[in-house]
Amino acid sequence: MPPPRGTPNILEGPGDYDVTSTIHNDTYPAIDPLKADLSGKAVFITGGSKGLGRAMVLSFAKAGASYIAAGARSDMTELAKDVAAAAATAKRSPPKFLPIQLDVTDPQSVENAAVAVKSEFGRCDVVVNNAGVLGRFGGILQTDPQEWWQVLGVNLRGPYLVSRAFLPLLLESELKALVHVTSVAAHLLNPTLSAYQTSKMALLKFSQLVHAEFGSKGLVTFAVHPGNCPTDIMGGPDGLSEHEKLIFVETPEISADTIVYLTSEKRDWLGGRYINVTWDMPELIAMKDEIVQGDKLKVKFIY
């Protein structure tokens, strides 16, 4: 389980313990990708070579996706083997796997990725904007302007460029699912990570704007907090302090399997909303009327 309520936790966000009565830190039967059927569907995931992105790629393979493209700057030779193995273990047909060298901050690189996916797959049903960077800790006066702006380049400009390039393909599909991996940090005020927190809050708003423009056309845009997972962005499990080990307790699999669960069927009413993967998904789905009628899980000004 996540840290008990009351544990000193600078990453505790609104609703962490209150939206659903049950919370999780690892995958669980209700979101098992083996229960999904994404045969015939095509998926594109940025930052797909390692960490959360790698887990997402493998989860979609287990869910039977027929076409999976992963965009990253690093080599994906081993990932291709892992995709085939994951599909075989799940007794699914091996997907066509397309590794794409990608820089999400470069418009031409992103456009080339969209062209490659259309050329190789002829379709794209799900896009996951997962690529992200943390940036250095430090106060505003100690930050390097170029490094500060680079964080926004990856975490905000990247999802914008990818969304813009892939929207025409997504809108031709039936599922039309767009996932932005944001963070609980969007809701927090920890001054030593101003670029990261600014980028993630802006990404929440961008998710709502995409929904406002394309929701009526069937696009479902999710803003997903992937949990506090000790991935490479945090220096891995060995890079955590003893206190941080009490906080960074989520697995990559809960993030990956939750995203597969959310995108495996149309959930239009969740469009433009913030979702924490530690929340119990069946319980969240059962709250549909309350969430829609109260216009909940969105960034807004309340007075």
Curated annotation (Swiss-Prot):
The pathway noted for it is: Secondary metabolite biosynthesis
This enzyme's EC code(s) = 1.1.1.-
Q: How is it used?
A: As colorants, MonAzPs are widely used in various food products for centuries. Moreover, MonAzPs also possess wide-ranging biological activities such as antibacterial activity, preventing hypertension, lowering cholesterol levels, causing hypolipidemic effects, and displaying antiobesity and antitumor activities.
Known CDD domains for this protein?
Answer: SDR_c
InterPro entries for this protein: NAD(P)-bd_dom_sf, SDR_fam
Name the source's superkingdom. Eukaryota
- The active site consists of 196 (proton donor), 200 (lowers pka of active site tyr)
Among SUPFAM superfamilies, the record links this protein to: NAD(P)-binding Rossmann-fold domains (SSF51735)
Instruction: Name the UniProt key words of this record, in alphabetical order.
Output: NADP, Oxidoreductase, Pigment
Q: Is the keyword Oxidoreductase in the record?
A: yes
Residue numbers binding NADP(+): 45, 103, 130, 164, 196, 200, 231
Q: Signal among the record's keywords?
A: no
Q: Name one GO molecular function term.
A: pigment binding
Query: Cystine bridges: which residues?
Result: none
Q: Name one Pfam family in it.
A: adh_short
Inducers of expression: Expression seems not to be regulated by the azaphilone pigments (MonAzPs) gene cluster-specific transcription regulator pigB.
As for family, the record states: Belongs to the short-chain dehydrogenases/reductases (SDR) family.
Q: What does this protein do?
A: Short chain dehydrogenase; part of the gene cluster that mediates the biosynthesis of azaphilone pigments (MonAzPs), a complex mixture of compounds with a common azaphilone skeleton very widely used as food colorants. Within the pathway, pigC intercepts the very reactive benzaldehyde produced by the nrPKS pigA to reduce the omega-1 carbonyl to the alcohol to provide the first stable enzyme-free MonAzPs intermediate, 6-(4-hydroxy-2-oxopentyl)-3-methyl-2,4-dioxocyclohexane carbaldehyde, also known as M7PKS-1.
* Protein's UniProt name: Short chain dehydrogenase pigC
Q: Which organism is it from?
A: Monascus ruber (Mold)
